[in-house]
């Protein structure tokens, strides 16, 4: 059983909290400490963003985080080194890399999958790789025991959901809003209806992200979803903090979110 599958099994119906931060933001030396801070606050799974120069699915907050990381020359190899360092003290919390296809292509899917597995990565979510084009990547990841996590949007047709159901492992990430990360306001009832429909096609846990900025919204989403994903709000916290206070502030915010979804 993968670490992700084991995480959901151990939750036994309780809801998972999946925080997102960008590797290398605000600087590379702080990322591993922040990851441990997320766990201290109650994170069940960590989504770790791979910095990219053209993060088209991300709003201004996460775009700025990528820019800060890229100023420090943080690339995919550095991100894998950070995961390996995190694993020296944490062998249980699943880590999912979230990013774009180009850096994986540049490394080569098989080489990437091998290095990711060795580092202690558990899953990979590429926001710009549709299921129709994912077979080669999914095959490389699966051969190394890594889960392929897919996005499902409000506009995803049932035919594409069916394709995702064949390839996805670990969990599925439902994008609760049209547009970029950190934007808009959620229609909780609509999200609940969409998740109920998706459950007819998807056998995996469903996490919901985009637009979850506070404990009240997290609690409302958790009533319908298996996991709550929070990214922009946490990255915003990092942006506003000093390097000395960032971990403590993240831990506090994650603890508030975790308490809300229990």
UniProtKB/Swiss-Prot annotation:
<dbReference type="Pfam" id="PF00290">
    <property type="entry name" value="Trp_syntA"/>
</dbReference>
<feature type="active site" description="Proton acceptor">
    <location>
        <position position="47"/>
    </location>
</feature>
<keyword id="KW-0057">Aromatic amino acid biosynthesis</keyword>
<dbReference type="GO" id="GO:0004834">
    <property type="term" value="F:tryptophan synthase activity"/>
</dbReference>
<dbReference type="InterPro" id="IPR013785">
    <property type="entry name" value="Aldolase_TIM"/>
</dbReference>
<keyword id="KW-0822">Tryptophan biosynthesis</keyword>
<comment type="similarity">
    <text>Belongs to the TrpA family.</text>
</comment>
<comment type="function">
    <text>The alpha subunit is responsible for the aldol cleavage of indoleglycerol phosphate to indole and glyceraldehyde 3-phosphate.</text>
</comment>
<dbReference type="InterPro" id="IPR018204">
    <property type="entry name" value="Trp_synthase_alpha_AS"/>
</dbReference>
<dbReference type="InterPro" id="IPR002028">
    <property type="entry name" value="Trp_synthase_suA"/>
</dbReference>
<keyword id="KW-0028">Amino-acid biosynthesis</keyword>
<comment type="pathway">
    <text>Amino-acid biosynthesis; L-tryptophan biosynthesis; L-tryptophan from chorismate: step 5/5.</text>
</comment>
<dbReference type="GO" id="GO:0005829">
    <property type="term" value="C:cytosol"/>
</dbReference>
<dbReference type="InterPro" id="IPR011060">
    <property type="entry name" value="RibuloseP-bd_barrel"/>
</dbReference>
<keyword id="KW-0456">Lyase</keyword>
<protein>
    <recommendedName>
        <fullName>Tryptophan synthase alpha chain</fullName>
        <ecNumber>4.2.1.20</ecNumber>
    </recommendedName>
</protein>
<comment type="subunit">
    <text>Tetramer of two alpha and two beta chains.</text>
</comment>
<feature type="active site" description="Proton acceptor">
    <location>
        <position position="58"/>
    </location>
</feature>
């Amino acid at each position: 059983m993968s670490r992700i599958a084991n995480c959901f099994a151990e939750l036994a119906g309780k809801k998972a909290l999946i925080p997102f931060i960008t590797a290398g933001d605000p600087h590379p030396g702080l990322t591993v400490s922040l990851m441990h801070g997320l766990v201290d606050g109650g994170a069940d799974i960590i989504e770790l963003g791979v910095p990219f120069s053209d993060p088209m699915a991300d709003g201004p907050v996460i775009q700025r985080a990528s820019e800060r990381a890229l100023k420090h020359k943080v690339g995919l190899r550095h991100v894998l080194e950070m995961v390996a360092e995190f694993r020296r003290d944490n062998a249980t919390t699943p880590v999912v890399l979230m990013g774009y296809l180009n850096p994986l292509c540049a490394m080569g899917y098989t080489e990437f999958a091998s290095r990711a597995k060795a580092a202690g990565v558990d899953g990979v979510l590429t926001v710009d790789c549709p299921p129709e084009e994912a077979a080669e990547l999914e095959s490389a990841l699966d051969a190394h025991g890594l889960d392929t996590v897919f996005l499902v949007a409000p506009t995803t047709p049932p035919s594409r959901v069916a394709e995702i159901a064949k390839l996805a492992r670990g969990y599925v990430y439902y994008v609760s809003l049209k547009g970029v990360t950190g934007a808009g306001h959620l229609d909780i009832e609509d999200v609940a209806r969409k998740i109920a429909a998706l459950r007819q096609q998807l056998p995996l846990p469903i996490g919901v992200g985009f637009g979850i900025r506070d404990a009240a919204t997290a609690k409302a989403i958790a009533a319908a979803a298996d996991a709550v994903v929070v990214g922009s709000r946490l990255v915003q916290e990092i942006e506003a903090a000093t390097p000395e206070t960032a971990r403590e502030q993240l831990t506090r915010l994650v603890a508030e979110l975790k308490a809300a979804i229990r």
